Amino acid sequence: MARISLVGRSAASGAAREAFERKIAERGNIPRMYRVFAHRPWLLTTMDAHFAAVMGSGTVPLRTKELLALQTSQENATRYCIASHTILAERCGATKDQIDALRDVERGPFTDKERAALRFGLQMTRDANRVPDAVLEELRCHYSEAEIVEIAAVVGLFAYFNRFNNAFGLDPTEPGEGVDT
């Protein structure tokens, strides 16, 4: 149960209302995280723009980004993000075996390129101060420095989202939720 109130569609105005309507058109619901951020519409606007920039642009495949988002969320035990990004990873072609192996990438059916990104993501999530040089060097064998920045941005963004959602005890958003609020 949420530890903070969720702004309803009818109470939202301006930028928050625009974000809500966009999410309804895209997903058929208003994510609970958006409904919390709507308490401060300028934060909702910048969060939404950052999310779109990290996940919707660049050259790292969306499938890899979704696996990283899900891996970070699993490591941080964030039910809200796990529920949402399991669905999104599957839509991008991730298999159940891959999803189940995200916290133990050595046993998972990943390409060498994916495994390098996931090793880095796991190390960054567990302790960003102690990412081994060998993990970063392996990443450089498969990705440009610009792509490595993209990968780190996904992990960092979801570390932020995970802590935000965990602190407020947000449960996963249900289909159609928020549309009639």
Where are these regions (language model features)?
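Hydrophobic alpha-helical segments
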Residues: 1-181
